Design a protein with these regions (language model features):
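Membrane helical hairpin/interfacial module
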Residues: 67, 77-85, 101
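Glycine-rich loop at the start of a catalytic domain that most often binds anionic cofactors/ligands
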Residues: 69-78, 96
Length: 172
């Protein structure tokens, strides 16, 4: 029988004995008190950066903290976040999204936890009234826990063509 691997959440996994030993050993080592001083954290961040082909990575102790940092970096305060209505960000983190990042969630009924490109385009193309907040970010979760761990295809058509920027010069 093939062993079942459940990746919905870290709380449904069972650590192996070597994982427990590694956690116990890590807990016995003294830690730094400053930003990014911990050797284990540095090693984890370097590994993540290498795997992702990035210059650097940053470890967050919780998904909520990582999501809030992403929102604050990518969505202006006062703008909506467009997401599937069942997204973790919409349900579990909805109040922190609005309260901490200043970005309320506009939830749509997606397909198996994912917004379709047509839904995103139709929503973004709707005329907004002056008193309505703009949509500042489209949030796509992968994998989607509430929808049974469904994953979006890596090449899913989620973008739409953007007009080419016009070059302006002082002489024209």
């Amino acid at each position: 029988m093939t062993p079942r691997i459940d990746l919905r959440s870290d709380i449904v996994s069972t650590p192996t004995s070597s994982m427990i030993e590694a956690m116990a050993a890590a807990a016995r080592r003294p830690r730094g008190f400053g930003m990014r001083e911990d050797a284990d954290q540095q090693e984890l961040e370097a590994l993540a950066a290498d795997i992702m082909g990035m210059e650097d990575a940053l470890f967050f102790p919780t998904c909520t903290m990582a999501n809030q940092a992403a929102l604050m970096l990518r969505c202006p305060p006062g703008a909506y976040v467009l997401a599937d209505r069942t997204a973790h960000l919409c349900g579990v983190e909805g109040s922190s999204t609005a309260g901490i990042a200043g970005a309320p969630v506009l939830g749509l009924d997606g397909v198996r936890g994912h917004l379709t490109p047509q839904q995103v385009s139709a929503t973004l193309d709707q005329p907004r009234q002056e008193t309505q907040m703009p949509i500042g970010l489209v949030w796509l979760e992968n994998t989607h826990n509430v929808a049974g761990g469904t994953a979006r295809a890596p090449k899913a058509a989620c973008s739409r063509p953007r007009p080419r920027p016009r070059r302006m010069s002082a002489g024209r």
